Amino acid sequence: MSKTMKVLVGIPGSGKTTLRNQLVAAGAVYTNMDELRQAHQAVLKKEGRNKFEKFVAQKEQEDLKRLLSEGHEVVVVDDTHLTLKGIEHHERLAKDYGYVAEVVFLEDSFNFAMCHKRNTSRPVDQHVPVYVVEEMAERFLKVHFQYHTRDVVVKKDRQKAIVVDMDGTLAHMVSRGPFEWHRVGEDTLDEVVYELVKFYKSTGHTVLVTSARDGVCYEQTKEWLDRHAVPYDMLIMKPENDSRKDVIVKMELYVKYIHQKYDVKVAIDDRLQVCKLWRALDMKCLQVNHGLY
């Protein structure tokens, strides 16, 4: 069995420590910069913040190289890793020591509200300020995208496009429940969003209807779009029986079906988490409802 170095990627409150502790209980060893900061507070008081951070980073690398050279089966790097450069550095280091690097993205990082709640439930001296967590959440979205598209060759002449959501954006539930997929044909059309879609279509944009609806209602959704004469070019939905969060699914669909071929000029959505995703990917995003769910 190959020796593994697990590179954890996630924001505060995303479950990195929980996962690390599970791995350690199974025999892994680890490094963690926060613990090194706590252990070397005397250096901070003596040298100041900038020199202290450099010291901690160097100390972690020394500890990590020592653990790798000792030949442990599983070595965990328990840090946020919110830059592609940092992730790739540890991938190279793992290879140098004969390890297989496994980059683990903590999916709870997509759920800022949950991470914020966990963060504030910690002892006061361990709180990360909310504005810092928000900034880290945006960086997580960026690095997740960069990592999963680093080998993608983007077409030079990508077609300009818009991405538009279904539920709560182009379509609205009237009497059905949110998971009554067999009744999506009963939804009403949002006339304002409809006019926006028609405008962008008339100006030469490809219209990509991108929905986190369960794939079981793909045909019903197509029928609804056709019945309401929505001028779309492609309907992209998640697979059947996929219960993951909208923001995770939208990221995956964008990477798989859109990024390489289309230059998205505008995204239209209602859910705040998804709008934050589009903005983190440097798209103009029109948020058409509060979407705090």
Segments and roles (model prediction):
Residues 160-174:
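Asp-based phosphoryl-transfer active-site loop
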Residues 17-73, 114-116, 174:
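Conserved substrate/cofactor phosphate-moiety recognition/catalytic segment
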Residues 215-263:
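Substrate-recognition "cap/lid" segment bordering the active-site pocket of phosphatases
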Residues 39-43, 81-125:
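ATP-dependent NMP and nucleoside kinases share a basic, alpha-helical "lid"
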Residues 14:
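ATP-binding Walker
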Residues 178-208, 216-220, 248:
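Short, acidic loop-to-helix structural element flanking the phosphoryl-transfer center
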Residues 254, 262-293:
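Acidic, Mg2+-coordinating phosphoryl-transfer loop and its flanking beta/alpha structural elements
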